């Protein structure tokens, strides 16, 4: 990726201090999508990275993972599978609960969305602790999917999510990094 492209993408991501709580610097990818050149460059970088990967499904996590995973799936000519909060998917699902900083959360996937042997790429907007993606990977593997790659627009390396996901056997790719939380 060229320095110019990286700067275009990085500069389009607005940083919002003290959101959602004091001491957090929120990295807002919705501002990236407001800039069609930056959004297109982001999707094209992902396409170039994964076009030879042989994936059969792209899985995106609620909600911002949909915004990058679905266009990537279209470009690669493969199916897109959403992983959502409980009660949002109409067909039979399986669920995975995971720990948050203060409490727990749960994700669900349709039981027929992944079939044995599907080669899956997981996509989300931001990697922090890795908890959401770990839960997503567990769901995919429970359904027989082969998931070895996870892609992000942003990585916050100081939080340690990349190390956590590598511990699950994932190859982790992020377009850009930001310091802090």
UniProtKB/Swiss-Prot annotation:
GO terms for molecular function: adenine binding; adenine phosphoribosyltransferase activity; AMP binding. It catalyses: AMP + diphosphate = 5-phospho-alpha-D-ribose 1-diphosphate + adenine. Signal peptide: none annotated. Pfam families: Pribosyltran (PF00156). It comes from the Bacteria. Its EC number is 2.4.2.7. GO terms for biological process: adenine salvage; AMP salvage; purine ribonucleoside salvage. Its main location: cytoplasm. It is found in: Cytoplasm. Belongs to the purine/pyrimidine phosphoribosyltransferase family. Catalyzes a salvage reaction resulting in the formation of AMP, that is energically less costly than de novo synthesis. Homodimer. This is Adenine phosphoribosyltransferase. It comes from Aliivibrio salmonicida (strain LFI1238).
């Amino acid at each position: 990726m060229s320095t110019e492209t990286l700067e275009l993408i990085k500069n389009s991501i607005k940083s919002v201090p003290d959101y959602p709580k004091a001491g957090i610097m929120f990295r807002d990818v919705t501002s990236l999508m407001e800039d069609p050149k930056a959004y297109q460059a982001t999707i094209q970088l992902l396409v170039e990275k994964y076009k030879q990967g042989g994936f059969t499904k792209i899985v995106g996590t609620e909600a911002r993972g949909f915004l990058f995973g679905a266009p990537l799936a279209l470009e690669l000519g493969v199916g897109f599978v959403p992983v959502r909060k409980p009660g949002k998917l109409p067909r039979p699902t399986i669920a995975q609960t995971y720990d948050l900083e203060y409490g727990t959360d749960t994700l669900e996937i349709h039981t027929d969305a992944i079939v044995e042997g599907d080669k899956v790429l997981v996509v989300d907007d931001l990697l922090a602790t890795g908890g959401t993606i770990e839960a997503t990977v567990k769901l995919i593997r429970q359904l027989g999917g082969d998931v070895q790659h996870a892609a992000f627009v942003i990585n916050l390396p100081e939080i340690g999510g990349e190390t956590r996901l590598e511990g699950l056997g994932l190859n982790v790719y992020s377009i850009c990094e930001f310091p802090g939380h």
